Amino acid sequence: MGLPWYRVHTVVLNDPGRLLAVHIMHTALVSGWAGSMALYELAVFDPSDPVLDPMWRQGMFVIPFMTRLGITDSWGGWSISGGTVTNPGIWSYEGVAGTHIVFSGLCFLAAIWHWVYWDLAIFSDDRTGKPSLDLPKIFGIHLFLAGVACFGFGAFHVTGLYGPGIWVSDPYGLTGKVQAVNPAWGAEGFDPFVPGGIASHHIAAGTLGILAGLFHLSVRPPQRLYKGLRMGNIETVLSSSIAAVFFAAFVVAGTMWYGSATTPIELFGPTRYQWDQGYFQQEIYRRVSNGLSENLSLSEAWSKIPEKLAFYDYIGNNPAKGGLFRAGSMDNGDGIAVGWLGHPVFRDKEGRELFVRRMPTFFETFPVVLVDEEGIVRADVPFRRAESKYSVEQVGVTVEFYGGELNGVSYSDPATVKKYARRSQLGEIFELDRATLKSDGVFRSSPRGWFTFGHATFALLFFFGHIWHGARTLFRDVFAGIDPDLDAQVEFGTFQKVGDPTTRKQAV
């Protein structure tokens, strides 16, 4: 037909039956990818250590999304929380993956059917006998159905009225589990970290969608508005649909990167801001000081810190530490975490407790500096030993571990002290297994980083797509010389000027 590759979609422009067919095929591809990806991830996922080797450390991408919607069990007999299960049924990881693949197959067959039987009576205008779609009516139908689905999700699935609920956790990602959520109708519902807002917003948005859908089904648009917004042109639908998608992509990129109730850290890993603000470090110190006030020893207080909380306070779990083009999971970077060595406490020969200054997010290397509780530099690992005044050897720094595997162990050997001081720059110290996966020691990002990068990038591309197609549909007559009221079926590519039989192209 002589179409360039970037204009091939014009073949379905005036063909409602085949336009439907290609969209059904697209749904088949999306659903098939989701199911296949889920099965692949389940094949490589190791559920044995949900604390030190959770799904986000292993680079799982679709498993966290299934889990946040209430799926926790596998046909393999394991549960995401670390327990064992028997007969999880269809509401399981494999069950949902399988239903997506079956649905994909059905959509594939439906797409073929609609491609073959494209000339259906439903697409024909009774008055003219030509193919046409009542786009405002279709908009009303879709808005109504989307509203029903949205309302149903918020009122039944999230609330547990008919469904499992959603993943809910505490602010430090320690006690997460799937549970029913009551809608939050007050001001707290607008807090992005309050799960109740998910239920209330879906109920409210769904109700609005249902009412808006009924409005558009019962009220016809004014003629001037219909013509002004080109409501009879399918490219108007494309443009506004792209707008909806890019807006949603920008929103979820934000909720993922900055964190929200919809992106729990147990499923997607911590955010970079939790490292930047010392979020987990403050909570750990608060718990230790509470333990000391209850007359626990320093060793006992640190031993009560959950390993899960200590692991969050490690820079290797910061999604901003991985480069955008470093492929692979976090486990492929710094290795699989095996155990917490404990919290190192450094002291100089005068008995002052020293604190290692932590590495900021965007540094690859950082000077090792130890300060006292007033922030005064007391020791360092100097770049030039000849000019040093605060070296570990000169200041007589020692280190003692509290909690973890090295609880009660102390070192005064300068080389060992410096080793642990360097590692303290990166947060709590963990033993990491690099051999199993041949990990290269270079930090990787978590699924939180990948999701944000992907959605922000595609949102930007789709923004330009919205502008492009919006301009094309609003100024179609200017760009192509086509009368905006032209309703004849034309074959694109046959004529140099669309619809003008006097400009037939010559066969080469």
Curated annotation (Swiss-Prot):
One of its GO terms (biological process) is photosynthetic electron transport in photosystem II. Binds multiple chlorophylls. PSII binds additional chlorophylls, carotenoids and specific lipids. One of its GO terms (cellular component) is chloroplast thylakoid membrane. Its main location: plastid. It holds the Pfam family PSII. The chain crosses the membrane at residues 21-36, 101-115, 140-156, 203-218, 237-252, 457-472. GO terms for molecular function: chlorophyll binding; electron transporter, transferring electrons within the cyclic electron transport pathway of photosynthesis activity. It is a multi-pass membrane protein. It is found in: Plastid, Chloroplast thylakoid membrane. Keywords: Chlorophyll, Chloroplast, Chromophore, Membrane, Photosynthesis, Photosystem II, Plastid, Thylakoid, Transmembrane, Transmembrane helix. PSII is composed of 1 copy each of membrane proteins PsbA, PsbB, PsbC, PsbD, PsbE, PsbF, PsbH, PsbI, PsbJ, PsbK, PsbL, PsbM, PsbT, PsbX, PsbY, PsbZ, Psb30/Ycf12, at least 3 peripheral proteins of the oxygen-evolving complex and a large number of cofactors. It forms dimeric complexes. Belongs to the PsbB/PsbC family. PsbB subfamily. One of the components of the core complex of photosystem II (PSII). It binds chlorophyll and helps catalyze the primary light-induced photochemical processes of PSII. PSII is a light-driven water:plastoquinone oxidoreductase, using light energy to abstract electrons from H(2)O, generating O(2) and a proton gradient subsequently used for ATP formation. NCBIfam families: PS_II_CP47 (TIGR03039). This is Photosystem II CP47 reaction center protein. It comes from Brachypodium distachyon. The lineage of its organism: Eukaryota, Viridiplantae, Streptophyta, Embryophyta, Tracheophyta. The gene is psbB.
